[in-house]
């Protein structure tokens, strides 16, 4: 498809080279716009990627200091803000593109319906015209037999493009429907432009002027036909009276031979004039009957076309409902995916916050542990310094005497100063418990 498009665009011998040049210029603008937008997005993503790389590099060499932790927190907040800003910008762009896509689809649907209506209208109108032409001969209608108002109305229709004023039936019906809805007030212009995307405001204003003139001429035509019917009825009564008088006149003078020839000639002239008036009236009646027949056929064809359009609109309505249902299902699916993505993102954010919180806690514990170890090392070093100072104060001037190892110690000498009985004599008395007086003299049973 891209190849066919370029073959039309760059074909110098094409009949639509000017239109293709305009499309080519528009396409180049859109391509440049897409390139600029792509470069901007790549720049934003590269910036976020670099910040993430810096954060990863900082996490490889963790320092248990409050300044380092604060720096990591600032870097994470900066990355999070950049990602949220990027997502919000893209969301707004996508929403705008979706609105433009819906508007374009509505315009394409309206144009497609219009083309289908043209196809149906042209074929059916041609069939109806052939049927009417075969039923009634054309030479029966002459401009001289029709009233002036009818001729003006028909001439106006021929000069301005028929009963739709040169518009197709779909656009004209929408125009009339909206105009009747607002009862002809000027406020209906804006709504007409919404229903007819292919028409400009000047075209709608010109069609409104034409339609006002059309209604005025049609009203004059109806009044003229009504007046013609009244006159026809009056002439019919006059002709009937003349015929009745002509039939009764010979009977009145039948028995009078003295009637002269002059009266007979006058009577014949009156009869001839009455017959000519009757023929002319018949011709006018046939012309009006044919015009009425044409109008009836036109009304029937219009009803048939309205019925076809109604069925076609029902079909389009069904298709639109089906399409709308599919779009709604797709929208719900996308909303579900979006909601799931948001939940996952929220979970990831919660996990990231938890990891960050745990990392901060671990860093705090590590910092406390390092501080405790440092305090113990400082205390130990201080103790060593204190002992060294004490050693420096004490003087050791003891001479070496190996023979003192064989001498008794002071403690031993103190023990040997007082020596008690050795206990080597015979054991003559063994102490026993005293015997109560009331048991003395009682022998012990064995």
Swiss-Prot record:
The keyword Cytoplasm applies. Residues 247-277, 394-430 are annotated as: Disordered. The keyword GTP-binding does not apply. Keywords: Coiled coil, Cytoplasm, Cytoskeleton. GO terms for cellular component: centriolar satellite; cytoplasm. Residues 23-116, 219-400 form a coiled coil. InterPro entries: CCDC148/CCDC112. It comes from the Eukaryota. It is found in: Cytoplasm, Cytoskeleton, Microtubule organizing center, Centrosome, Centriolar satellite. This is Coiled-coil domain-containing protein 112. It comes from Macaca fascicularis (Crab-eating macaque). The lineage of its organism: Eukaryota, Metazoa, Chordata, Craniata, Vertebrata. The gene is CCDC112.
């Amino acid at each position: 498809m891209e190849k066919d498009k370029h073959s039309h665009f760059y074909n110098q011998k094409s009949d639509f080279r000017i239109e293709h040049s305009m499309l080519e210029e528009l396409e180049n603008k859109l391509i440049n716009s897409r390139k600029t937008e792509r470069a901007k997005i790549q720049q934003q993503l590269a910036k976020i990627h670099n910040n993430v790389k810096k954060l990863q590099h900082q996490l490889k060499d963790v320092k248990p200091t409050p300044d380092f932790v604060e720096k990591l927190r600032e870097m994470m907040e900066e990355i999070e803000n950049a990602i949220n800003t990027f997502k919000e910008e893209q969301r707004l762009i996508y929403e705008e593109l979706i609105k433009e896509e819906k508007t374009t689809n509505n315009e394409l649907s309206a144009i497609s319906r219009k083309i289908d209506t043209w196809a149906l209208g042209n074929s059916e109108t041609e069939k109806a015209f052939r049927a009417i032409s075969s039923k009634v001969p054309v030479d029966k209608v002459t401009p001289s037999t029709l009233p002036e108002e009818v001729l003006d109305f028909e001439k106006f229709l021929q000069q301005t493009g028929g009963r739709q004023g040169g518009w197709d039936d779909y656009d004209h019906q929408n125009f009339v429907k909206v105009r009747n809805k607002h009862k002809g007030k000027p406020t209906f212009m804006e709504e007409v432009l919404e229903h007819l995307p292919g028409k400009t405001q000047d075209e709608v204003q010109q069609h409104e002027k034409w339609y006002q003139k059309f209604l005025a001429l049609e009203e004059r035509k109806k009044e003229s036909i009504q007046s013609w019917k009244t006159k026809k009825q009056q002439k019919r009564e006059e002709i009937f009276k003349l015929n009745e008088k002509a039939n009764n006149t010979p009977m009145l003078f039948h028995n009078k031979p003295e009637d002269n020839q002059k009266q007979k000639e006058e009577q014949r002239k009156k009869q001839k004039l009455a017959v000519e008036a009757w023929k002319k009236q018949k011709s006018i009646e046939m012309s009006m009957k044919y015009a009425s027949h044409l109008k009836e056929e036109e009304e029937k064809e219009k009803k048939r076309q309205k019925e076809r359009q109604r069925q076609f609109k029902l079909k389009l309505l069904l298709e639109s409902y089906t399409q709308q249902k599919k779009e709604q299902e797709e929208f719900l699916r996308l909303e579900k995916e979006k909601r799931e993505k948001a939940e996952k993102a929220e979970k990831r954010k919660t996990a990231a916050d938890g990891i960050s919180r745990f990392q901060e806690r671990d860093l705090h514990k590590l910092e406390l542990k390092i501080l405790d170890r440092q305090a113990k090392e400082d205390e130990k070093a201080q103790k060593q310094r204190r002992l060294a100072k004490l050693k420096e104060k004490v003087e050791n001037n003891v001479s070496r005497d190996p023979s003192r190892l064989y001498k008794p110690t002071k403690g031993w000498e103190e023990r040997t100063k007082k020596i008690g009985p050795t206990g080597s004599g015979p054991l003559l008395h063994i102490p026993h418990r005293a015997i109560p007086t009331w048991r003395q003299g009682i022998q012990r049973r064995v």
